[in-house]
From Swiss-Prot:
This is Ephrin type-B receptor 2. It comes from Homo sapiens (Human). Autophosphorylated; ligand binding stimulates autophosphorylation on tyrosine residues. It is a single-pass type I membrane protein. Changing H679N: In prostate cancer.
Amino acid sequence: MALRRLGAALLLLPLLAAVEETLMDSTTATAELGWMVHPPSGWEEVSGYDENMNTIRTYQVCNVFESSQNNWLRTKFIRRRGAHRIHVEMKFSVRDCSSIPSVPGSCKETFNLYYYEADFDSATKTFPNWMENPWVKVDTIAADESFSQVDLGGRVMKINTEVRSFGPVSRSGFYLAFQDYGGCMSLIAVRVFYRKCPRIIQNGAIFQETLSGAESTSLVAARGSCIANAEEVDVPIKLYCNGDGEWLVPIGRCMCKAGFEAVENGTVCRGCPSGTFKANQGDEACTHCPINSRTTSEGATNCVCRNGYYRADLDPLDMPCTTIPSAPQAVISSVNETSLMLEWTPPRDSGGREDLVYNIICKSCGSGRGACTRCGDNVQYAPRQLGLTEPRIYISDLLAHTQYTFEIQAVNGVTDQSPFSPQFASVNITTNQAAPSAVSIMHQVSRTVDSITLSWSQPDQPNGVILDYELQYYEKELSEYNATAIKSPTNTVTVQGLKAGAIYVFQVRARTVAGYGRYSGKMYFQTMTEAEYQTSIQEKLPLIIGSSAAGLVFLIAVVVIAIVCNRRGFERADSEYTDKLQHYTSGHMTPGMKIYIDPFTYEDPNEAVREFAKEIDISCVKIEQVIGAGEFGEVCSGHLKLPGKREIFVAIKTLKSGYTEKQRRDFLSEASIMGQFDHPNVIHLEGVVTKSTPVMIITEFMENGSLDSFLRQNDGQFTVIQLVGMLRGIAAGMKYLADMNYVHRDLAARNILVNSNLVCKVSDFGLSRFLEDDTSDPTYTSALGGKIPIRWTAPEAIQYRKFTSASDVWSYGIVMWEVMSYGERPYWDMTNQDVINAIEQDYRLPPPMDCPSALHQLMLDCWQKDRNHRPKFGQIVNTLDKMIRNPNSLKAMAPLSSGINLPLLDRTIPDYTSFNTVDEWLEAIKMGQYKESFANAGFTSFDVVSQMMMEDILRVGVTLAGHQKKILNSIQVMRAQMNQIQSVEGQPLARRPRATGRTKRCQPRDVTKKTCNSNDGKKKGMGKKKTDPGRGREIQGIFFKEDSHKESNDCSCGG
């Protein structure tokens, strides 16, 4: 503390004496001063002597024997010359009243000092008035020493010197006035001046003369300018000039910039001598160049590598220059039908670096002797084609009976700097077993005023099984960039929503496992005009009437059979039809609403990039360090400095070298998607770099990375309100995306990024569809020809690939669970198939540890099997807002239960709205034996029953574990149904028991076996407890429901 006070005191010590600028000095006058006096009998100008016996002009007054003296002396007009505070130095002598014989009591030994401001010399004999107002009094001046008769006789001079100041002054000038009211004195000298801080060199900066402030306590900030070859650091460099013209409080400093070192006590910045360099600004001295580098001139900021040696972009400047590696050695190939295993040994010379990796270049040489060409996009590489760290690779999906040449390149961090191609070893192989050819012709099957039905034949060379077709169309009068694309699993499609009488251009292409073939040639078809349509109706009217009579009986029979056989099957079929209808009508939105446009609908994807993403010049981007690796290349952090804007921290995704055109297109598609979004909870695209290498996507930088790993690193560190705030941000971002008609498909905590302010932003747009078939990553599982993250995906999306905003809501519920469990893996160590089975059997995840009931209820609402019953993202945002505004709603936690454990919730419960009384509801769920118990305990209405918890069920007298489970699950579903009627309001549902970890669960078991004793309710045959290696907590497996009609076999996990 003492050192801190000392430092503060040193900051306030003046650095250099003030400079005084004189405005008026009476001692320099060579003639009469000519000041105005009032009355004439008062002050008198006389010649006198100063303390050095120099002749000077003075004023004196001594009317002490006359009463009521009021003698004024006024100077001439004094211009202030920009000064804000004026100082007056007065030298005077005063006669001691007591030394004057017979002096009356009115004798004074003081006088008053006044000033008056004016814009010009306007004073007269009578103006300003000789009184205190309008004059402004500065002070009453008293003598420190006065002289007596003895002093006078001995010619002893006792001169007093007093300095007074006043301000602020703002007009062009001023007058001074001295008022005597009964003294005997002599005004020997008057000097009027102002002060300013002098020019000074301090902390490597030059500060020019600065006028002091208007008040004695004023501190006027002055900006310094750095000495030659120095730059400011930390904060703008400042000194403060006080009211007395003294420099105080130095802030900031200048340091020699890169390439210069400080000499002569820091007053000069000298360029680094030849053979030395200095990379950064600072006080440190220049250092010698590292190995294999040199400088060519003084003032070097880095040393240039010698010929044949290079420095990578991210290498520190003090690191020795290195070279490229030699070729790999001893390549071994093993062919198996259309797949290949390659192995090799590292090169002899790594170039002096430790970042050696390998790239695989595939060339297809066909069956003839023509030149080889790069392989197509259908070839698969495991683990990847570029940037291999191990000397082996597995290559699959090659063409049958085709000759290939594979080049194994050895590259390191300076390969891109070298003008020479990477060194490589090559191997030639021939496979033992491609995209389909173009569709040759398309036919019009039928048309109406707003639709056309088309069909086409299979490609002449399908080269495998046709998975589906993609049809693109646009109005002939419009540009091809306005094309709309739709997919069809068959070679027939009906295009709806067209204009009457308009001509449309159609093209189609087929897709196999090898990818899409080429589009067919452009074909033109026209919809009917209104007149043509009316004519066709009249021609078909007799046929329609005749057919209707014959078909009516058949239709009635079909309807009756359909209703009787399976009402639920009808509902499912209706839902699927609705899905198809939605697929064709989803593009019709409210006029004026911004709609997401799929970049893959553009024939030239580069056009989508140009339309939605801003091109950034590579010179504006500075890559600093690699922070990760993605599917297409490295992810780096760096800075972006656009002209006219401040420098910002950004994340940079780079496209690895050796990419194919398809990889480049897929890589930039994410930018085309992100560029359409502008929301605080959606990752912001700054722009792209496509006109230089490497190709880059530049986004805002999120300091805390992905949400799942961030939560795991900060387990238990946040309040519930903070976690709800994160969830609210994610929901707001998803609401924005849903309003734009964008379906994410891969919403998970790993795809949410977190910045330093804990703001969560949705990211990862479009890349999941391009994941390689890597069996080592169980997150994405093949399903119906695509990759699906099973644990986060809604059941209809898994089974039918029906991705909608409602399926994103299901995924959002999983994200909620991830957040509240601090990044636990959903469904723990269950297999993906076990997860699918459990969801189909209507079980759901339990609440994580310390999860409020209201939040788990919202999760359950998101996991409604019927997607139409799930809340919209707008409702979710409103619900979370209400929780944040009312924190008390988050205090109710799901309690632990010693008698029952229901980790996965049964959702197959009848709709309570179909019953009139609680008794009917109990009968419907086969719990009628408790009707009297419910009535006696006061649970006689659905509103009261919906609020029951486990302790209420126990108090009613339900002791059997299976019955507790049945009633509790039914109450939970009742709450969900109530929320669907009253809109989702985040009301608490079931409070779920938990184990010692974030959640509690039981081992899977064969539902056909009896695994517990019906007499004591204790579970037998359970697996041992497992320890989650990623979390270090004891957790138990998953509990699946048993046959609901076997009440005696309902079991629970141990407590």
